Amino acid sequence: MNIQALLSEKVSHAMIAVGAPADCEPQVRQSAKAQFGDYQANGMMAVAKKMGMPPRQLAEKVLEQLDLSGIAAKVEIAGPGFINIFLAQEWLSAQIDGVLTAPKLGVAPVAPKTVVIDYSAPNVAKEMHVGHVRSTIIGDAAARTLEFLGHKVIRANHVGDWGTQFGMLIAFLEKQQSEHHEAIALADLEAFYREAKRTYDEDPAFAERARGYVVKLQGGDEYCRKMWKQLVDVTMTQNQLIYDRMNVTLTRDDVMGESLYNDMLPGIVADLKAKGLAVESEGATVVFLDEYKNKEGEPMGVIIRKKDGGYLYTTTDIACAKYRYETLKADRVLYYIDSRQHQHLMQAWTIVRKAGYVPDSIPLEHHMFGMMLGKDGKPFKTRAGGTIKLSDLLDEAVDRATKLVAEKNPDMPADELNALANIVGIGAVKYADLSKSRTTDYIFDWDNMLAFEGNTAPYMQYAYTRVLSVFRKAGIDAEAVSGVTRIVDDREAALAVRLLQFEETITQVARDGMPHVMCAYLYDLAGLFSGFYEHCPILNAEDEATKQSRLRLALLTAKTLKQGLDTLGIETVERM
């Protein structure tokens, strides 16, 4: 059910009937204030200007042609030519009944596309840290949302599994295996990497062996490949534990590391040279881009192969985009990578387009995000200034949630308390991130994210259980609600309109990759339910028909909160 689309079609039809151009934009929007109706059509200003008439005069003509019979209770013109639409309560009632029985909360099926989503992308032989939080959480919400709408989503975990550091890591793994058991060697990845680097810096013979292993690994040496694969496997096994713990849908099957594109790189460099896009410059292979200028105002040179024959991230990203279009058959590609990589990606994609590897009709979208900051406004780190491990962050979230839940439920059995604390704690970390616009930096604050009031996961999870408690108090199964919806009160109507705006909301999230829009919608919905619950008695309604009608609104609220939170990757519980 997409009210905005329905009204846009009706208003557009009326505008064309009075002489507006066929491509006119009715600009139908949800009204910000109740006095302006449920929806406003704001497109008269721009169209009237083109038609050479006052906007109000155009609005009056449009109103004469606008057929909203059975949909709107009244339509009026405000100000210079805004059209305010007040939806009819009978129509809202019928739509609620339709949505309650429809699959997917009445969200219309889409023409399915293949969407590749690049997110998370941790590095091999390093533990995931807070720097991976935003890409992982926001990317996963986008994947869940697009999948819910019916698209074929291919998750691409672009793991950092290649590069010169692997010579050092293989040499150190070999050293550790000769001295200890290999499982011990890789038990603490962070310590393993640190020790490998220290040995490399301090032991010239070790460094020499490490450099030799880089060449061998790149040449496909069997022993080096075996050691390299061991490093990748141990890392991804540890990362999978974190993904599962965070309720993130990534699996081992989604790993498409940098190494996947190695065999494509020589061919791409040769092809770019053959097409006249790349040239030799001071021993390196370079693409000069007119679209980007250096400090001297000359076309910027983007190196795709170094003097020593080594390739760069740009070369890999060119291959990666080509692979996603040609092999994965992507109709759309989303990259959840931080904003500092923007120019690098734009340069790679400019080369991709010029070479004809991905046509202009296939969007390559950088859904960038800001940084996670501490309360001091600086990048979020440990007290000692180190990087915070993601596993430590999740441990602290669960510890804090355990104390919080235990205070509110002193008699809760330990296993139930533990399960609930995990859902609340992990949900709080995820929701705190998702509820902020991804394009801005955000302050990480434990007290705010674990609060039971405001736009937080604990509040939203509690709001869901509060709706369910209505059915528990009534002693009825939620799905056993009968009767029909019969909206007669303004608060019922306001709740109904918001419930019917779920499709508009999820469509916007899918289009823009902005999960905070869903968070804001759900928070608003929970607030409207609260007002409805306080002013419209449900179990003590004046008659059985009213009671059933209000139970139907409560049921759809519960379903919408649960589904909305699920698209964000936030788990719900039946009681708190």
Swiss-Prot record:
Reaction it catalyzes: tRNA(Arg) + L-arginine + ATP = L-arginyl-tRNA(Arg) + AMP + diphosphate
Record keyword Cytoplasm present: yes
Name this protein carries in UniProt: Arginine--tRNA ligase
EC nos: 6.1.1.19
InterPro entries: aa-tRNA-synth_I_CS, Arg-tRNA-ligase, Arg-tRNA-synth_N, Arg-tRNA-synth_N_sf, ArgRS_core, DALR_anticod-bd, Rossmann-like_a/b/a_fold, tRNAsynth_Ia_anticodon-bd
PANTHER family: ARGININE--TRNA LIGASE, CYTOPLASMIC, ARGINYL-TRNA SYNTHETASE
Main location, first listed in the record: cytoplasm
Keywords of this entry: Aminoacyl-tRNA synthetase, ATP-binding, Cytoplasm, Ligase, Nucleotide-binding, Protein biosynthesis
Subunit structure: Monomer.
Source organism (scientific name): Erwinia tasmaniensis (strain DSM 17950 / CFBP 7177 / CIP 109463 / NCPPB 4357 / Et1/99)
UniProt keyword Transcription regulation, yes or no: no
Segments carrying motif 'HIGH' region: 122-132
Alphabetical list of Pfam families matching this protein: Arg_tRNA_synt_N, DALR_1, tRNA-synt_1d
Family assignment from sequence similarity: Belongs to the class-I aminoacyl-tRNA synthetase family.
Compartments reported by the entry: Cytoplasm
A single BP term in Gene Ontology: arginyl-tRNA aminoacylation
GO cellular component, one term: cytoplasm
GO molecular function: arginine-tRNA ligase activity; ATP binding
CDD domains found in the cross-reference section: Anticodon_Ia_Arg (cd07956), ArgRS_core (cd00671)
